[in-house]
C-alpha cells in the first residue's frame, strides 16, 4: 500500500535541491582534496598572498532522466550490496579519448572552481589532522586569549551585548516608572517604552592567560649550482607551504632561514624564497650554521626544535663525512631533522643513501622526491612525523 506523507506544514523536507546542494558540496571538497598534490607541484605559490586563487577542475552532476535503451540483449542487475554511484554492466558507449577517433556519446561536464591560498591551507590542515606541539617544561610563553564571562557592565562592544540582561534592565526601569506614577496618583499611561542607552548591558570578559609551547623551525636549503631552476622551485614550494601552514596553526613559532653553497648564510624570509646562488656544495656548512643558531638562540631544554634540509643530494666528496657528523649532531639537539632530497641524479650515489645507512637516530626523517607529484606525499610524511605528540 502506498503511503503519502503530508508536507503542508514543512515545505523544506521534500525540497530535492537541498540534497543536490549537499552532494555538490561533497563533490567540490572531494575534488579539492584529490588535487592538493597537483596544486602544490604545479602552481606558482611561493611568495603569494593568502588571497591568491587556484583553479580546481570539478566534474558536474547530471540530473536523473529516463532515456531510450540500446536494444541490447538483457540488462545488468545488482545483487543487493551495490554502493551509491556504482555502475552496473559495461555498456557499449564509445567516448572520444585522446587520439582514439570520434565518439558518439555526450561527454562529462567539467567546470572549474576557485579557492584561495588560505582555504588551501584549511584543506591541508583537515587532511593532515596534525596534533599540538610537544610541551616542554620550561618552554612556555604566556599569552592572552578570550576568556570567560565575568559579570556585566554598562559599556562595551556590540558583539558582547547581553540581550537578556538588557531587556531585564529595561523592564526594571519601566516598573520603576509605573510605581512612581502610582505614588503621584497620575493617570498617565505608558504606551511606548523604548530602549535607552542606560538599559544596555554588556558581558565583562576577563582574558585568561594561556601557556603556549616555544617552537622554532630551521629551514636549510642547498643553493649551489647543481640545484637547477626546477629543483630550487620545488624546494621553495616545499618550504613555503610548511611556513605558511605552521604560521596559521600555531601561535608561537619562530623561523630561521639558512641557505648555503660551500659557505652558509643566515637570511630573512624574503631573501630565502627569492634569491638565487651558484657555486659548489658543502652540506656540512648549512647544518653547522643551523647548530650555531640553536646554540646562540634556542636552548634545546626550553625549545621544540625542528630542522628541515632540502638538497638534490650532490655533495663535494671531501665533505661527506663532515656532513654525516653534522647531521648526527643536529639530531641530538632537535625534536626532528628532516632531509628532503629533490630530483636526485640517477648516475651517482646521493647523500640520501649515505645518510640513511649511517644515521640511526629515530629523529632523522629522510624523504626522496623523484618527481613533482611526490611533493605532497613528502610534505605529509614530514609534517606528521615532525609534530607528532610524544
From Swiss-Prot:
Disulfide bonds: none
Species: Clostridium beijerinckii (strain ATCC 51743 / NCIMB 8052) (Clostridium acetobutylicum)
Name listed for the protein in its UniProt record: UPF0229 protein Cbei_0567
Compositionally biased spans, kind Low complexity: 89-103
Pfam families cross-referenced by the UniProt entry: DUF444
SUPFAM superfamilies: vWA-like
PANTHER family reported in the protein's UniProt record: UPF0229 PROTEIN YEAH (PTHR30510:SF2)
Region listing for Disordered, in residue ranges: 77-108
Taxonomic lineage from the root: Bacteria, Bacillati, Bacillota, Clostridia, Eubacteriales
Family classification: Belongs to the UPF0229 family.
Amino acid at each position: 500500500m502506498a503511503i503519502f506523507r503530508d508536507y503542508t506544514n514543512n515545505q523544506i523536507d521534500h525540497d530535492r535541491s537541498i540534497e543536490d546542494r549537499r552532494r555538490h558540496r561533497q563533490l567540490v571538497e572531494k575534488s579539492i582534496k584529490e588535487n592538493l598534490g597537483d596544486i602544490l607541484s604545479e602552481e606558482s605559490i611561493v611568495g603569494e598572498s593568502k588571497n591568491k586563487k587556484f583553479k580546481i577542475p570539478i566534474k558536474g552532476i547530471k540530473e536523473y532522466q529516463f532515456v531510450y535503451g540500446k536494444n541490447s540483449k538483457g540488462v545488468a542487475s545488482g545483487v543487493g550490496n551495490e554502493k551509491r554511484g556504482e555502475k552496473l554492466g559495461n555498456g557499449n558507449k564509445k567516448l572520444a579519448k585522446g587520439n582514439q577517433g570520434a565518439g558518439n556519446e555526450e561527454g562529462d561536464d567539467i567546470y572549474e572552481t576557485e579557492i584561495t591560498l588560505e582555504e588551501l591551507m584549511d584543506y591541508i590542515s583537515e587532511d593532515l589532522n596534525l596534533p599540538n606541539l610537544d610541551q616542554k617544561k620550561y618552554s612556555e610563553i604566556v599569552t592572552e586569549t578570550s576568556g570567560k564571562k565575568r559579570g556585566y557592565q554598562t559599556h562595551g562592544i556590540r558583539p558582547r551585548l547581553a540581550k537578556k540582561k538588557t531587556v531585564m534592565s529595561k523592564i526594571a526601569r519601566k516598573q520603576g516608572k509605573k510605581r512612581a506614577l502610582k505614588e503621584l496618583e497620575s493617570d498617565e499611561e505608558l504606551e511606548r517604552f523604548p530602549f535607552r542607552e542606560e538599559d544596555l548591558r554588556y558581558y565583562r570578559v576577563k582574558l585568561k592567560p594561556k601557556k603556549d609551547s616555544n617552537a622554532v623551525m630551521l629551514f636549510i636549503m642547498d643553493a649551489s649550482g647543481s640545484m637547477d631552476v626546477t629543483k630550487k622551485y620545488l624546494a621553495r614550494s616545499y618550504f613555503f607551504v610548511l611556513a605558511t601552514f605552521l604560521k596559521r596553526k600555531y601561535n608561537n613559532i619562530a623561523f630561521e632561514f639558512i641557505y648555503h653553497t660551500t659557505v652558509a648564510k643566515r637570511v630573512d624570509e624574503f631573501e630565502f624564497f627569492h634569491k638565487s646562488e651558484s657555486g659548489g656544495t658543502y652540506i656540512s656548512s648549512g647544518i653547522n650554521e643551523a647548530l650555531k643558531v640553536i646554540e646562540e638562540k634556542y636552548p634545546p631544554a626550553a625549545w621544540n626544535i625542528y630542522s628541515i634540509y632540502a638538497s638534490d643530494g650532490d655533495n663535494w666528496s671531501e665533505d661527506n663525512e663532515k656532513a654525516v657528523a653534522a647531521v648526527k649532531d643536529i639530531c641530538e639537539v632537535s625534536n626532528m631533522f628532516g632531509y628532503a632530497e629533490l630530483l636526485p641524479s640517477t648516475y651517482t650515489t646521493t647523500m640520501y643513501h649515505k645518510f640513511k645507512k649511517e644515521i640511526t637516530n629515530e629523529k632523522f626523517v629522510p624523504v626522496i622526491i623523484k618527481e613533482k607529484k611526490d611533493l605532497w606525499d613528502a610534505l605529509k610524511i614530514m609534517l606528521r612525523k615532525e609534530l607528532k605528540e610524544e
